[in-house]
């Protein structure tokens, strides 16, 4: 089904409010297998809204109008839609009774004729009762096009959509099912390059890449009658994707760290540690506790994480971790030696299975001759200690710190999975 959203309200065009309803509705319609082709905002003007309705009626099967259902003269959505369709306005009995109760319980408010506008419906509409407000919504069909009228305030629109609109539109047949694959260690441009043939020939399912700070996600989407049918199609596409290799011959499946919109590298590592009954600690310099903070963000972190160290200065590294100051001066705080020593000392001091050491140059200035974005990450395990050097150039100080923690978590992930 082709659909479009028309947001009615001059306050949207003047930037006084943000049109969050469009994002919410687009997401919900997509879940129902309804394709939003257009989004438009129009002011509180009858002539312009009539013009837009004329355009929408010729290109869409479902037209969703948000806003303009209030009691004032500039709330003209239902009135304009009725005029466009050549229909009259009727009063919805339930909405009218709600107005009665509202004003009966608030004698300090005067009820005026304008208030009755909130209980009006376009003739022939299926009413959508407003659970958190006074203005009734509705769905009316004319010449093969459905018109849905919804209130503007999100606190009124969202309950109406979730509790009334979704059940009505769920009979549409197919729904949209999605699966999000999360990758670390490859950029969006390279991922799109190696997926070029698949993307070029895609029909259903489809692939949508998204670049995030330090990682890339792929959203696989398909329309299906049920979850089993969707899983069959998505499993096949995922298998085809993960069989590929990067331009430098790494297995793409090894760069996949998790699934879902709300997942993260920290959550993935936490769950792996819990499953394997392992513990972890960290000593951080440039990240200043960010690694530990991300780990502790999730419930159950205390099962695998007892604490750690933030050792920003050379003195702190020496005093708290017991790393000889002469060695730090010899090798420098930005070095493989220091990253490994931090990881090893932290692991031994807190008797953890894994220790992480993070040191480097967050920026913007150089340190010890290294440019901003130079990071050394050490990992200590029962099998030994090692480290990597990462160059995160052209990023803000905040991004350097965040991406550094992703690399650290990935080291732990690979160690746990023995990749």
UniProtKB/Swiss-Prot annotation:
InterPro entries: CinA (IPR050101), CinA-like_C (IPR036653), CinA_C (IPR008136), CinA_KH (IPR041424), Competence-induced_CinA (IPR008135), MoaB/Mog-like_dom_sf (IPR036425), MoaB/Mog_dom (IPR001453)
Domain of life: Bacteria
Gene3D superfamilies: 3.30.70.2860, CinA-like (3.90.950.20), MoaB/Mog-like domain (3.40.980.10)
One matching Pfam family: MoCF_biosynth
Protein family: Belongs to the CinA family.
Protein name per Swiss-Prot or TrEMBL: Putative competence-damage inducible protein
